């Protein structure tokens, strides 16, 4: 029978378990029991997790224990189940099902008791005193109110649960122990009365030990407690008997002496075992609730608080000791071996009595410490632990589970908000123990504070009112005085404003006076400048007349004279007055006896005959002594002007810079003007007449026809520095006038004399090079510096070397000379010296700093070297070493790169200690006249005047003012425009100023000595495709918006696209390669599918309606197709059936002999065997009879006609194979293709728009829809077809892919059409051509074009290596079979000399026309023997023609000033969109808006607009040039335009125009000197 269980006691135990776990969870979560509700049954997930993590969950412990049972117990249970003796497993599972309703009932009873106690407490009188707190409790500590509250629920059976928020606890283990200790202390305190109170939060339950009712109730309950104690014991024993788990656990507990049960803390040490939980709960109840020997009544419970002190050292009661299991004591008996004593000293006295005491003497820590240190450390740790515990209780610190650390609370966490209620300052037990007196006193204190605050506020208000009244009366008392002060202050402000206005007015008047004064000074300076210019022209005319007297002492052969005269005649016919001015002497009639401009104008208006009659008396002066003295005086004047180069260069430079930087200065000093060349001119009329006479007698002209051995008194033509005249006037004047040649004895020592060719020079000089040597020698003789500005390719290097050789041979001046050149031509100069003048000691100064230091060692010794060649970069870097050495000649190659006079390089070179200076440049004029002035000032920086003052060559502002505006006017209006007199005079004066210091000869000047150069512009019409693409691009809305936007980058991109269209349409839009559109299925497939579908539907029931001819015997049988009559007869005769018949009869006889068995008996094996044998024989007999029947049937078949008759009467297709028509129609496929090859080549030109992929399979019949062949046959045929070569490959390729015809490459482009004609003419006449283009892709098109026409060509572009260029050029020059050399204008110019070609073709023009100029010089240079023709292709009515028109205007500027041929891309800053597009430009684009305002980023922007290959080629070309540019790069500010200052002056004049009478009075007052 099942044991009888005490369910009531088990329910109480369950209730106690739930109360304890709930309290434990509350303490763990909130660290105190404030607001703790004992009736709250927590079912939250956090509560369940808490129990499971700490092994306090009963259900999970039972499940785990069941899983951990041993195999023996399982076998025992299984045996009990089988035998039926064991109880059903449902008893175990239904324990909690029966207990839980009783637990709910216990909760409801407890709730009723609490409610009744609360109601009785409310009826008590207020006079009852509250029992004081026992002495063992801690002092009152203010505990802050928790921030968060958990809502708990008071649970009753059948009622809802009300939840409260409770504070969180940090240390569950410590709180549990403290709870048990506090229970024991409280039980000890209340042991005399046995009164247990129930605590709750709202309302708090008060202690009733002092009331009589409480005493009587306690006595009644004491007897009940004893009886219930015995009941609890009996019920506990009963539960243990009924529950095998508890019983086993108790046995386990007794067996394990180490298993203790300490104050309920075993709930945390049970390792999730439910049996231990129940056992521990029983022992916990006994030890915690019954410390005095009595059992607590079920009606009331006492719950402890964590705020009470711990008392771990109190002895346990007898009951507690009984409840604890006995401990096993282990005693260790160690029998130590006896000591071997050989000496009395070996006897050791034991320090410890036993091993245990010895082991206890060791105290282990992280470090080895003594016992005293260990004890002190333990005390400190206990003190620290106590402080931590107190901190936890008082809320000063908290535990952070995330970081596993203790954290202190900050003041902000502890202090409540200002508007919040004050926190509870006492514990939850003590906050309800205030008496009425306490409340009364507190209320009195509060009211007292309120009265004091009210009193203070009223006093403050009264004080504030008194202050307001006092201030009011003070304000009334000082009103008069304040009014006087305000009036005085107002008057002062008015006086100050009036004074400031007057001062401002006088300041403006002072500025106006300074401006007017400056205008007067400027006007005076202009007058003085004109005076200085006139005097400078006189000096220039005198110097030039002396230089150009070379024919008086020159003994040229007659051929040279004829060539010179022929050259002069050509110049006269061309009407180039500038070249005539350069080759002829200029009369000094520009400066008359008074030296004024009016006289100059009168002389310029006279004809040559009138001038001759006017100055006829000057030709009669023959006094040689006077001429010698005058020439000596002139020489002394010139020497004095040119030798004083040491004092005032800095003054002049600083003066010019100060004028540029500070344009608004109060006063501007007088500029020296051009007095550098004319300071020592005598103003006496007689001297001037003598000078003019001298010039007239000694002047000479190179360009006239005449024989030196002819008439002695014939004088040469002398052209005045008058404005350019028409061609007819020049011809008439030159034909009518002749002058006599002066004798050599009367030659001026300053004149240019013919010098011998130095013996050190190897090689032969050309005539113009010999004239250049004479000019350079005259500069040295006259102690003058100069600029050799011959065009590139005329041999400036050899002329310079010949000058140095002349100085060494004739003047015995061996240097040292300094030659500064760009880095790229440094070695080239050294090689030229070794080639033409090997007698010089040349020092090439380059290398690392150490190498240069080695080269400088000993260079101060005499004749250490004769010539030093270095680069601009190194000469500036080592300028201190070069400045210490005295140089005879300083020669600067490519001197136009020092055009910036503000740069440190210009100033450093200017200060070198040199006797003479020579500048070599091919492009002396760049963008403005300021750069030309910088070169001239570099030659003559300082000049001495008569009065001892020193001044520079000329002021930059004056130079710009004299020549800048008239020259700009000529460029803007054009060369053919009729110029006014002032402009003509200015240009003539500029020529006169430049002529003494500049020798400039173009290739056209020496065309008799060099092959001619002819430029042709070929205008090409656009093809139809080009015109369509060009117009389409221009008509796009996006293009119009881009051009109207004014964005330079967008406009350049548009221009680049237009240039691509002009060069070739394939650059803009490639002609496509057409292919057929390929689809998978053909049209026939869909038709066949539809046809098959319709056919199948129509013949769906054909077998039902059709007639079978075979059944009607209207068809030949199969015997007639296979058998003949003879075969059928022979088969019937030869059939073999006898063996089969014999075997059949034998088997039948055998079967008849045996008695048949109808029903076999399976019990008899013999009878069953005979039955099976009989059946087997019958089966064989049936098979043999069927075989005999089939044999007879097949052998006895007879055909109706026989196959022999059918074949005889049938006409087959093989009979037509051998006929001639059949042989023609069945030719092989290869034969057909070969025969039709010509047709295929001619007519297979149209690519079908669409092709299909299934035509081949359909033609063969192996497509999917064809049922003619089986699938295996189809696969076999397809594999065989794929392995065969396709005979239609060529035809299919021509029909599927349509490549553009090669001839379209030429006919799509107008330039290539013209080029084809031009190349054909050139090749027929034996010419060779260079074709230049800017774009690399055009070179690819040109390659295709030349390959199409079969020309032999070579190619050189930016990708060609530098070392390969020389190989290509040498091969082209040496191999006449190569007709064309195509080059990129960006391929660089170092080491390229293509004199083997005599034709240059510019397919397109470069952005920078200087590149085109350099490309021309590769062919037209020294070494060329034939005339060079230059063809420039320009697309008509396009952007190219407009760009060329604007570029020619820039070229004309060079012809006006110095006749140079170089210009840069700065014309983009001058052009507008309408200038480039012409009539095709949109109407809404402004006319005068330039493309680009700033030129700094022009090259970068152009590179971005070009293709990547072209940009790379340009970059590589610039990288080569960059070696030279690094020598000339300077971070200084560029020279300012001269026009800017003049514009500022005009603006300043307009600013002060139109003054009132007051302002006029003020200005007069200042002017009279009364202001200062």
Curated annotation (Swiss-Prot):
It is found in: Nucleus. One of its GO terms (cellular component) is Swr1 complex. One of its GO terms (molecular function) is DNA binding. Residues 424-496 form the HSA domain. Residues 216-232 have a biased composition (Basic residues). Pfam families: Helicase_C, HSA, SNF2-rel_dom. Residues 179-192, 238-269, 590-602, 726-737, 1511-1522 have a biased composition (Basic and acidic residues). It comes from the Eukaryota. The keyword Transcription regulation applies. A motif (DEAH box) lies at residues 893-896. Keywords: Activator, ATP-binding, Chromatin regulator, DNA-binding, Helicase, Hydrolase, Nucleotide-binding, Nucleus, Transcription, Transcription regulation. SUPFAM superfamilies: P-loop containing nucleoside triphosphate hydrolases (SSF52540). Residues 1314-1464 form the Helicase C-terminal domain. The keyword Hydrolase applies. Its main location: nucleus. Residues 61-94, 119-291, 304-323, 555-604, 624-675, 694-749, 1505-1556 are annotated as: Disordered. Its EC number is 3.6.4.12. Residues 558-568, 643-657 have a biased composition (Low complexity). ATP binds at residues 790-797. It catalyses: ATP + H2O = ADP + phosphate + H(+). Catalytic component of the SWR1 complex which mediates the ATP-dependent exchange of histone H2A for the H2A variant HZT1 leading to transcriptional regulation of selected genes by chromatin remodeling. PANTHER family: HELICASE SRCAP, HELICASE SRCAP-RELATED. Component of the SWR1 chromatin-remodeling complex. This is Helicase SWR1. The lineage of its organism: Eukaryota, Fungi, Dikarya, Ascomycota, Saccharomycotina.
């Amino acid at each position: 029978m099942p044991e009888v269980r005490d369910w009531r006691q088990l329910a109480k135990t369950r209730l106690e378990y739930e109360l304890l776990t709930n309290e434990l969870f509350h303490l763990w979560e909130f660290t105190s029991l404030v607001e703790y509700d004992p009736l709250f049954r927590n079912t939250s997930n956090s509560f369940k997790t808490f129990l499971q993590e700490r092994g306090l969950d009963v259900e999970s412990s039972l499940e785990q224990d069941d899983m951990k049972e041993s195999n023996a117990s399982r076998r025992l249970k299984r045996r009990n189940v089988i035998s039926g003796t064991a109880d059903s497993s449902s008893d175990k599972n239904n324990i909690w099902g029966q207990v839980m309703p009783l637990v709910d009932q216990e909760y409801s009873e407890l709730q009723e008791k609490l409610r009744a106690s609360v109601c009785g407490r409310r009826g008590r009188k207020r006079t009852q005193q509250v029992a004081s707190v026992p002495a063992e409790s801690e002092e009152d500590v203010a505990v802050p109110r928790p921030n968060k509250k958990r809502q708990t629920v008071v649970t009753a059976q059948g009622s809802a649960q009300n939840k409260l928020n409770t504070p969180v606890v940090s240390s569950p283990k410590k709180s549990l122990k403290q709870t048990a200790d506090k229970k024991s202390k409280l039980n000890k305190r209340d042991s005399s009365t046995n009164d247990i109170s129930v605590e709750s939060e709202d309302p708090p339950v008060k202690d009733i030990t002092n009331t009589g009712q409480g005493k009587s109730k306690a006595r009644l309950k004491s007897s009940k407690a004893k009886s219930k104690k015995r009941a609890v014991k009996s019920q506990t024993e009963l539960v243990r008997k009924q529950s095998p788990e508890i019983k086993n656990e108790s046995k386990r507990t007794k067996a394990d002496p180490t298993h203790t049960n300490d104050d309920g803390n075993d709930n945390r040490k049970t390792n999730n075992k439910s049996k231990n939980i129940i056992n521990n709960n029983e022992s916990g109840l006994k030890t915690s609730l019954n410390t005095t020997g009595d059992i607590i009544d079920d009606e009331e419970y006492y719950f402890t608080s964590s705020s009470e002190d711990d008392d771990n050292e109190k002895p346990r009661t007898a009951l507690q000791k009984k409840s604890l299991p006995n401990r096993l004591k282990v005693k260790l008996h160690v029998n130590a071996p006896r000591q071997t004593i050989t000496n009395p000293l070996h006897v050791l006295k034991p320090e410890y009595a036993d091993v245990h005491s010895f082991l206890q003497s060791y105290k282990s820590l992280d470090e080895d410490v003594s016992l005293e240190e260990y004890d002190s450390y333990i005390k400190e740790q206990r003190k620290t632990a106590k402080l931590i515990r107190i901190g936890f209780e008082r809320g000063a610190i908290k535990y952070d589970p995330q970081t596993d650390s203790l954290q202190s609370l900050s003041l902000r966490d502890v202090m409540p908000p200002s508007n919040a209620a004050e926190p509870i300052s006492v514990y939850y037990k003590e906050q309800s123990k205030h008496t009425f007196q306490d409340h009364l006193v507190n209320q009195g204190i509060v009211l007292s504070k309120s009265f004091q605050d009210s009193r203070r506020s009223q006093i403050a208000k009264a004080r504030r009112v008194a202050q307001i009244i006092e201030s009011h009366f003070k304000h009334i008392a000082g009103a008069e005085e304040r009014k006087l002060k305000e009036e005085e202050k107002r008057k002062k402000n008015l006086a100050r404003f009036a004074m400031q206005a007057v001062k401002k007015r006088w300041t403006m008047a002072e500025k106006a006076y300074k401006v007017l004064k400056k205008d007067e000074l400027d006007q005076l300076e202009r007058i003085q400048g004109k005076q200085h210019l006139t005097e400078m022209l006189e000096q220039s005319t005198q110097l030039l007349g002396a230089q150009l007297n070379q024919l008086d002492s020159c003994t040229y052969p007659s051929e040279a004279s004829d060539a010179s005269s022929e050259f002069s005649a050509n110049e006269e016919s061309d009407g180039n007055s500038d070249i005539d001015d350069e080759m002829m002497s200029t009369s000094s009639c520009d400066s008359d006896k008074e030296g004024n401009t009016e006289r100059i104008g009168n002389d310029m208006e006279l004809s040559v005959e009138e001038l001759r009659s006017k100055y006829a008396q000057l030709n009669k002066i023959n006094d040689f002594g006077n001429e010698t003295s005058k020439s000596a005086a002139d020489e002394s004047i010139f020497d004095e002007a040119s030798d004083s180069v040491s004092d005032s260069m800095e003054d002049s430079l600083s003066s010019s810079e100060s004028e540029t930087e500070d344009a608004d200065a109060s006063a501007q000093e007088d500029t020296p003007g051009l007095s550098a060349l004319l300071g020592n001119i005598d103003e006496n009329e007689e001297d001037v007449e003598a000078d003019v006479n001298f010039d007239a007698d000694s002047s000479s002209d190179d360009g006239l026809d005449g024989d030196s051995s002819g008439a002695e008194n014939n004088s040469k033509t002398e052209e005045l520095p008058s404005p350019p005249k028409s061609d007819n006037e020049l011809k008439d004047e030159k034909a009518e006038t002749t002058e006599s040649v002066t004798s050599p004895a009367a030659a001026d020592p300053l004149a240019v004399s013919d010098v011998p060719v130095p013996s050190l020079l190897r090689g032969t000089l050309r005539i113009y090079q010999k004239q250049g040597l004479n000019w350079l020698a005259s500069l040295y003789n006259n102690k003058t510096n100069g600029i050799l500005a011959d065009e590139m390719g005329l041999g400036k290097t050899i002329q310079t070397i010949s000058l140095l050789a002349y100085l060494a041979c004739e003047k015995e001046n061996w240097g040292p000379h300094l030659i500064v050149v760009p880095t790229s031509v440094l070695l080239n100069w050294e090689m030229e010296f070794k080639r033409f003048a090997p007698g010089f000691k040349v020092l090439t100064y380059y290398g690392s700093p150490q190498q240069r230091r080695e080269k400088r060692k000993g260079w101060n010794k005499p004749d250490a070297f004769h010539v030093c060649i270095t680069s601009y970069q190194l000469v500036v870097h080592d300028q201190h070493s070069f400045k210490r050495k005295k140089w005879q000649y300083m020669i600067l190659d490519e001197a136009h790169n020092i055009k910036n006079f503000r740069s440190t390089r210009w100033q450093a070179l200017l200060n070198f200690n040199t006797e003479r200076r020579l500048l070599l440049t091919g492009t002396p004029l760049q963008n403005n006249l300021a750069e030309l002035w910088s070169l001239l000032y570099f030659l003559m920086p300082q000049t001495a005047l008569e009065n001892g003052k020193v001044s520079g060559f000329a002021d930059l502002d004056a130079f710009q003012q004299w020549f800048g505006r008239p020259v700009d006017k000529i460029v803007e209006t054009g060369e053919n425009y009729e110029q006014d007199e002032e402009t003509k005079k200015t240009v003539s004066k500029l020529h006169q100023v430049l002529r003494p210091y500049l020798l400039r000869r173009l290739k056209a000047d020496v065309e008799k000595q060099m092959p001619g150069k002819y430029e042709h512009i070929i205008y090409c019409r656009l093809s139809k495709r080009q015109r369509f693409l060009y117009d389409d691009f221009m008509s796009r809305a996006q293009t119009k918006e881009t051009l109207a936007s004014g964005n330079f980058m967008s406009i350049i991109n548009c221009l680049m696209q237009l240039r691509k269209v002009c060069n070739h349409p394939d650059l803009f839009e490639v002609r496509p390669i057409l292919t057929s559109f390929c689809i998978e299925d053909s049209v026939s497939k869909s038709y066949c599918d539809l046809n098959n579908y319709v056919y199948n539907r129509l013949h769906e029931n054909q077998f039902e309606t059709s007639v079978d001819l075979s059944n009607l015997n209207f068809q030949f049988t199969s015997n007639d197709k296979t058998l003949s009559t003879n075969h059928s007869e022979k088969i019937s005769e030869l059939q073999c059936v006898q063996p089969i018949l014999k075997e059949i009869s034998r088997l039948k006889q055998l079967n008849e002999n045996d008695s048949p068995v109808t029903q076999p008996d399976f019990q008899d094996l013999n009878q069953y065997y005979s039955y099976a044998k009989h059946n087997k024989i019958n089966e064989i007999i049936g098979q043999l009879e069927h075989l005999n029947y089939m044999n007879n049937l097949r052998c006895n078949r007879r055909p109706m006609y026989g196959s022999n008759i059918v074949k005889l009467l049938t006409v087959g297709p093989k009979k037509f194979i051998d006929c001639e028509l059949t042989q023609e129609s069945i030719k092989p496929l290869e034969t057909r293709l070969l025969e039709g090859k010509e047709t295929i080549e001619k007519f297979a030109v149209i690519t079908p728009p669409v092709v299909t992929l299934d035509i081949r399979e359909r033609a063969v019949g192996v497509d999917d829809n064809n049922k003619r062949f089986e699938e295996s046959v189809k696969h076999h045929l397809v594999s065989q077809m794929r392995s065969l070569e396709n005979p239609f490959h060529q035809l299919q390729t021509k029909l599927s892919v349509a490549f553009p015809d090669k001839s379209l490459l030429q006919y799509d482009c107008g330039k290539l059409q013209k080029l084809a004609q031009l190349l054909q003419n050139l090749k027929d006449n034996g010419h060779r051509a260079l074709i230049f283009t800017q774009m690399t892709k055009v070179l690819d098109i040109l390659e295709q074009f030349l390959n199409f026409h079969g020309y032999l060509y070579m190619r050189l572009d930016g990708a060609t290596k530098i070392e390969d260029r020389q190989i290509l050029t040498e091969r082209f020059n040496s191999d006449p079979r190569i007709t064309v050399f195509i080059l990129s204008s960006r391929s660089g110019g170092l080491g390229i000399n293509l004199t083997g070609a005599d034709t240059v073709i510019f397919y397109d023009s470069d952005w920078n026309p200087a590149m085109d100029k350099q490309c021309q010089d590769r062919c037209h240079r020294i070494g060329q023997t034939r005339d060079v023709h230059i063809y420039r292709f320009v697309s008509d009515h396009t952007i190219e023609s407009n760009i060329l028109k604007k570029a020619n205007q820039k070229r004309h500027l060079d012809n006006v000033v110095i006749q140079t041929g170089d210009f840069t891309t700065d014309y983009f800053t001058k052009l507008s969109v309408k200038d480039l597009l012409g009539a095709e430009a949109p109407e809404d684009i402004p006319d005068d808006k330039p493309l680009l305002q700033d030129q700094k980023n022009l090259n970068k922007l152009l590179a971005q607009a070009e293709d990547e290959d072209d940009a790379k080629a340009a970059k590589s070309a610039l990288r080569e040039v960059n070696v030279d540019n690094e020598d000339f790069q300077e971070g200084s500010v560029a020279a300012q335009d001269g026009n800017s200052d003049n514009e500022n002056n005009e603006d300043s004049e307009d600013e002060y125009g139109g003054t009132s009478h007051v302002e006029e009075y003020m200005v007069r007052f200042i002017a009279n000197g009364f202001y200062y």
